[in-house]
Amino acid sequence: MNTKEPHKRVVQGKVISKFAEKSAVILVERKVVHKKYRKIVKKFKKYTIHDQDNQVKVGDFVSAIECKPLSKTKSFTLKEILVVGV
């Protein structure tokens, strides 16, 4: 049989806060076209990610992958650090 892996979202963003052990907040930016004015607008969203080894620092650009909920707000884990100290 052919088993499929569940599709998991991958987000990339900048670490803006390292508030607790094994946790960090990343800011993800996306660009959308405004419905009425047809102008490209930046939209931002914050995600709390799980950092098992405490390796990220504020200013790093990281990639995070969706996982099962780890707490009330954490449902992403650190995948890799793309750029150190942006």
Curated annotation (Swiss-Prot):
Xref: Pfam families: Ribosomal_S17 (PF00366)
Molecular function GO terms recorded: rRNA binding; structural constituent of ribosome
GO BP annotations, alphabetical order: translation
Taxonomic superkingdom: Bacteria
InterPro entries noted in UniProt: NA-bd_OB-fold (IPR012340), Ribosomal_uS17 (IPR000266), Ribosomal_uS17_bact/chlr (IPR019984), Ribosomal_uS17_CS (IPR019979)
UniProt keyword terms in alphabetical order: Ribonucleoprotein, Ribosomal protein, RNA-binding, rRNA-binding
Gene3D superfamilies, per database record: Nucleic acid-binding proteins
GO cellular component terms attached to this protein's record: cytosolic small ribosomal subunit
Family label: Belongs to the universal ribosomal protein uS17 family.
Cited NCBIfam families: PRK05610.1, uS17_bact
Subunit (UniProt): Part of the 30S ribosomal subunit.
Function in brief: One of the primary rRNA binding proteins, it binds specifically to the 5'-end of 16S ribosomal RNA.
Name of the protein in question: Small ribosomal subunit protein uS17
Gene that encodes it: rpsQ
